[in-house]
Amino acid sequence: MAGSRRRQWRAAATCVLAGSLVALVSACGVVTTKEDRRAAEELADKHFPGQIKAIGARTLFPGTGGSEVTFAVADDRDAVVRLRINAEKGTCDGKECAGVLKEAVARGRAEADAYRILRDAFDACGYEVIALGSPGAAPYVVAELTNATVQRELAGIGGCVQRWVAASGADSPLAKAKASYVNVVSPAVAEKRNRGKESWPTMMRLTRGNLIASLTKHTHHAASYDIVDGQVDTAGRARVIRPFKESQAFGKTVQDAVREELRATYPNVVMTTYQWVWRLEPGRVDRQTGYLLFCPEPDERGRCVNSDDAVLVTADEHGNPVGQIRIVHDVREGTGALRLPPY
């Protein structure tokens, strides 16, 4: 990387000695994000005059070349248009730019339309959508899940999902899906989120990586709802999503405890670090059930690889097992996929 930068600086210095800034940009091929943005604005003025306005630009990953330029849409407060352009090559996503921009504008408008269907469905039953991640990803809503409220809140969100499915239309990907998912964060976490600027288009604010990061750095829940022929099982089920360090600590606690219990039957037992989805027990947020994998005997290197044995365990929020564990054998197809029984 350092050598590459030195070569770029040597090339730039040669150009400066040879001539003007124009020579630096065009003859030497050193095109900045500023030039990419200017080229994108000229493209927009030509093909969508007065309809879209550039509001930001970022350099794409080093080595790919070009920049991503972001546009607001004049007649749609929610829509955002993203164009990846390489002014040096005169291409957008490696293609002819006019067509790519046209597709980007259409996509931005369609995503805004889909967002409004989602927003209205959840607004109608009292839940605000505060983040989306990437377009089409599970939305984030706010609710306080406690033992006293979890079933009611999950059912309420499930009612929103049913409205969302119905409003999306029978031929929509959502209506044809087997399930839908909603992320649930607490009011305290939502209050501290990175909100961005109100002047930004809605789809720009709600899909930003730093917004999602400000939510997911805290423990939250993901609710799932089965869909059959457009009808949603509104009761739903929820699982716990923990930040990495908390997940590791939880996993170590439950694995250590289960290992000790298994040693009564398998003195040489070896646990894997694998953790299955930890689903909340019905009506509880302080009880969650999931699978751990183990080997009754280690391999010749002292490891547990391609385990065919699992244990189903219910634990408290800290990872301490509660109640009896259940051992399940033959959970893997040969050395391939797991086939853990549902629970």
Predicted regions mapped to residue ranges:
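Secretory targeting and sorting signals
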Residues: M1-G29
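Long, acidic/polar, low-complexity amphipathic helices and coiled-coil-like
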Residues: I85-A190
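Extracytoplasmic/periplasmic C-terminal soluble domains
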Residues: V141-Q255
